[in-house]
Amino acid sequence: MKQSGINGVKTLTLVVCAALASQAYAAVNYESANYIGSQPEGSVRFIIKYKDKSQSQQMMTNRSTTSVMNNNNITIAGFNAQFVRTMTIGAGIFAVPDLKTTKEAHLVMDTIASNPDVEYVEVDRWLRPFAAPNDPFYNDQWHYYSEYGVKADKVWDRGITGKGVTVAVVDTGIVNHPDLNANVIPGSGYDFIQEAEIAQDGDGRDSNPADAGDWHSNWACGKYPDPRYEKRNSSWHGSHVAGTIAAVTNNRIGVSGVAYDAKIVPVRVLGRCGGYNSDINEGMYWAAGGHIDGVPDNKHPAQVINMSLGGPGVCGSTEQTLINRATQLGATIIVAAGNDNIDAYGVTPASCDNILTVGATTSNGTRAYFSNHGSVVDISAPGAGITSTVDSGARYPSGPSYSLMDGTSMATPHVAGVAALVISAANSVNKEMTPAQVRDVLVRTVSSFNGTPDRRIGAGIVDADAAVNAVLDGNVVERPIDELKPQAEYRNPQIKLIRDYQMMFSEIKVNGRPGNTKFAVVKADIRHTDPSQLKLRLVSPKGYEYAVHYDNIKNKSSELITFPRDEQMNGYWRLKIVDTKRGVTGYTRGWSVAF
């Protein structure tokens, strides 16, 4: 396709509209379109990522082209579409306000994907906070000091309080509150909500991360008669989360924070009805210190990022890419599992890799009835009856207050706060910790549930005292693969088809290895047109799952996995492969496990 003589409108058509005769189809995340019926009417948008070095990608990243796009409408599969903006990863966002059904979304996605320049297309999903207000305020923070709390009080007694650590709260923003203000870095934060109607503060993206309120009227956020979309007052959700992490302590008022000397950077990504995945993930990446065009760089990059939010659907390419980049910048990302009592594998970003996914427990040490569960949940924390900082206004900010809330949203900041304590403890003895080390020590030092949970919600309850002890004792070193020498390797050479948008397992039976192991080395040889759409897990004989990170270039994986618990060696070990998008298939040429 030549560019010469193409005016603004034709250039836009070249970038978006498909060459229908082409057979080189891109990865289409059909699953991301399954839930558009639960979004506010007229809110459907698509994220389109073009292949690197393609003509379309070059035009997408060209500022003059995108400025032309912004002033023109186009048609895709008969639907009017408007260019919104270009993301930091080079993907374009397009709004299709008249689209209403999953079938229509699939038609649009197929049309886009038939362009040979397209790498993938997915819906810009709508995510929401994972909490709901409960009972009136009472000053009883059992979740810090009781048998099934996080045992933060024992760490405070040793002077470990989160000092020197920055935590980003990616949420609804934050309110003016005497129990928060001193721990919010002055002038920090940003409002990433682009749509003024969602932001409810009169404008789009700006440097003011204040929570303007997320109230909404009946059925503004979804269809009648779903009770989830009845009118609701503002939640002040981000302030409640921030208070659990780092409320000012020993000030004779209100509540305490888990890491009460840590500092908060508020990142506003949720407003009326929630927020777009694209805004949320760029806000998360910015919080870690990543650059976003048009936004001043964050002068206070966070070592810990709290994301008490989510929505239906498995982790997509866009969020996983930005999570990986944020992790590479040194941020430990803590995410809520969700509150629908379902398998969190079907929730995003809870199902992403390189994060810690958090379930919720009660004061009795049992699984909270609402907590999502499953193999992607890594750890749990108190999430029922949690008191923290909010505003007293029903719709708009009117003054400081306190409230009791339930949710995995409330459990997640407990883990984020303990992560800050762990990093602070490492700093106190001149140690540096990677995000992988922080995640490992948190999971490896958990306290026990009260009995076996009715559904799997991770290794146990986060334990600040045990985690900090592990750091101070030096028990956090990531051991290189050559220091852990497996005694034997077990192989399955079978060729197995990886079917389109399905799950497959390949088994290895281990005999003659009594005892337990703390690690395994996994090797896999997988051939696939688009390996980025695959999720790999090693499943132990006990049924615990561990992420296997896949080499997209060489189509092979060789990875050391350390376990947070002893795993028996004898029994059936399985490699689980999930194809998360439609359009292409592949196969495995065998795999092995060694310990």
Curated annotation (Swiss-Prot):
Record-linked Gene3D superfamilies: Galactose-binding domain-like, Peptidase S8/S53 domain
Keywords: Hydrolase, Protease, Secreted, Serine protease, Signal, Zymogen
Entry-linked Pfam families: P_proprotein (PF01483), Peptidase_S8 (PF00082)
Alphabetized PROSITE patterns for the sequence: P_HOMO_B (PS51829), SUBTILASE (PS51892), SUBTILASE_ASP (PS00136), SUBTILASE_HIS (PS00137), SUBTILASE_SER (PS00138)
Enzyme type, top EC level: hydrolase
Keyword flag Secreted: yes
Protein family (similarity comment): Belongs to the peptidase S8 family.
Protein name (Swiss-Prot/TrEMBL): Extracellular subtilisin-like protease
